[in-house]
Amino acid sequence: MKLIQGVLFQDFYSDKKKSDRSSSLDLRNTKILNLHWHSGFQTDGREELPQVSAFNAALPDSFISFSDRRKMLFSCGVHCYLYDYKIESVWNTPSSAISCLRKYQCVIAPDFSVFVDMPRALNVWNIYRNRWVASYWQSEGINVIPSASWGNVDSFEYCFDGLPENSVISVGHVAVGRDSSYRKLYRLGIETLIERKHPDKLIVYGEPLGFYPETEVVYVEEKIQQLRKI
């Protein structure tokens, strides 16, 4: 009888702990979801992507990665051209890096992955996250440079929505490769971005484009390019 009571007693507290953990998790998730979807940002396009404000300030001489933000090189800008898992925190806990990022000259909006062969819903989701974080950071006083990314030609229906006109805009040019079809698609994306948004300057993170778009281009070397020069 005592054994049974002991088991029941243990199960009761075990269940209570699970319930407490679950309640805490639910509360945290509720706060995050409320923050994400009840933020009051203006939206743009059919997918209702948050509208990012223009960036027209002077650019810093160099950029460091989001992973290196704690090195306190505040005269630099910060870029987020990293694997998604290294920047997930800006979505999962949006306010966690605010106080640090405010000290930098500017921050390029996070570049969540968009791929040619990824389902449309996932590409829309990652572009939504890009626009939301950029808008949230701007609302918190951070100087944010909008960033653009795209998948296949069909993604042009939504991938430039939420980006401002006549602004500095950043794009990544890291994993395009030598495949001619991908390079043509990338060039078409650049040309479409310029046609629709008329950026004042285009920041290109990675290798040179190999062509000369009709706007001023500022190149930012990726880390591997910098290391090769050492």
Question: Where in this protein do the model-derived segments appear?
Answer:
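Residue-identity detector for glutamine
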Residues: 5, 10, 42, 51, ...
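Intrinsically disordered, low-structural-confidence terminal and linker regions
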Residues: 1-21
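Non-catalytic, usually N-terminal nucleic-acid engagement modules in DNA/RNA processing proteins
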Residues: 24-98, 118, 230
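Intrinsic disorder/low-structure terminal segments
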Residues: 8-11, 40, 54, 148, ...
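Eukaryote-skewed repeat-based solenoidal scaffolds used as protein-protein interaction platforms
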Residues: 67-70, 83, 88-229
